[in-house]
Each structure stands twice: as structure tokens, then as C-alpha cells.
Amino acid sequence: MNIVPISESAVVCSLPPPASIQQQRQLWAFARQLQSEQDIVEVVLGMNNLTVFTDFFVDFKPLVQRLEQLWAELKVSDFQGRHIEIPVIYGGERGQDLSDVAKFHQTTPERIIQMHSEPIYTVYMIGFQAGFPYLGGLPENLHTPRRATPRTVVPAGSVGIGGAQTGIYPFSSPGGWQLIGYTKQALFDKNQAQPTLLQAGDTVKFIVEGIEL
């Protein structure tokens, strides 16, 4: 693990590429352990890295030594994410790229739905928006380039494919992913103690709630 300071109160801990589920599991377990450590204010997970925010004026050298020791003693088996099922309505006005994705892969919309809803995905990280899950585990034969021209508005709840990943937009925003459906499930609720439905390390299964072709 490489540990580099990025400010007076933050360091980035990164692993060598490429990102993998094994390395992400290590980072998830490490982040959970760090949350109970003294002087650590926040831990933000990324892809193949995490950022540790500390109280101001924490000495860098002792901090790095402590992080290295904790990393060496890490027990990944202690980490267990949750499993969440998310209902999806595929196609229709809210999944308007489904036909284009099917054409790109020279198959039918029904087959795309089947391939997308069969796997169990893993939340690699939360980013872009509060609660936006970057999901690993998309079958290689569903990898699809992003749209050449991003949309100025993607409705909240939209389910899309972007390259080798799939995800869900918690809020309305611009976006360039291929939209294949939508969910009514809220991914963010500021009134909850844990406002994001999904967290890094959770697993997700899409359930076909409906099909609009």
C-alpha cells in the first residue's frame, strides 16, 4: 500500500492497479476498521484507494506508521456486506436506450434484460452523487460504451450501463450512461441515520418488476 499526504489533514492510501474485487474487499475492511480509530475523522472509499481525513496537526510520520501496521494486521474475513434486492422496470421512456444496447450487442431487448438481471453485483464504491453505486460484476457481453452525447437530464432512479459497470442515478442530473430501466426504490434519504441505501461492499440483485417494450 502506498500512502501519500494530500493536505495537512488527509492522506490517500492506494493499491497498485488494476482494481479487483479482492483488493476492494481489503479496502472495505480497512475502512471499517479505521472508522473506530482515534484522530480519524472520516474515511472515503474510492476505486483501488481510500482517503483518510484526520484531525488537524496530526503528525504525518506516526500516522503512516499506524496505518501501515493496521494494514499488515488486517483481517478481511471480518468484513461482511449486506445483500439488497432492487426492483427494476426495464425499457419504456425511462429505459430508452434498451433497444440501442440490444442492437449494439446484436441481440434482443429481452436478452439484455435477462443478462442484466441474472448476476449478483458488488458495490465497489459510492461516488458521482450521494448514494450513486458503482457496481462491479456486469457480464462482459454487456459492456457498452457510454453515449456519444450525454443527456442534460437523467431522471432519478434511472438504471444504466457505462462501459464495464452498471449503476443507478439517485438524483436527476446530467449523465452519459446508457439507460435501460428505472427503479422506484429510493437510494438516498437524508432523514435516515444511514442516508445511503447502498454502501461499498454490499451486493445487489436486480429484480424484474416490469418490462415496457
Curated annotation (Swiss-Prot):
Keywords: ATP-binding, Hydrolase, Nucleotide-binding
The keyword Transmembrane helix is annotated on this UniProt entry: no
InterPro entries linked to this entry: CT_C_D, Cyclophilin-like_dom_sf, PxpB
This enzyme's EC code(s): 3.5.2.9
Gene Ontology MF, one: 5-oxoprolinase (ATP-hydrolyzing) activity
Top class in the EC scheme: hydrolase
Family stated for the protein in its record: Belongs to the PxpB family.
Assembly, per entry: Forms a complex composed of PxpA, PxpB and PxpC.
Protein name: 5-oxoprolinase subunit B
Protein source organism: Haemophilus influenzae (strain ATCC 51907 / DSM 11121 / KW20 / Rd)
Taxonomy of the source species: Bacteria, Pseudomonadati, Pseudomonadota, Gammaproteobacteria, Pasteurellales
Gene: pxpB
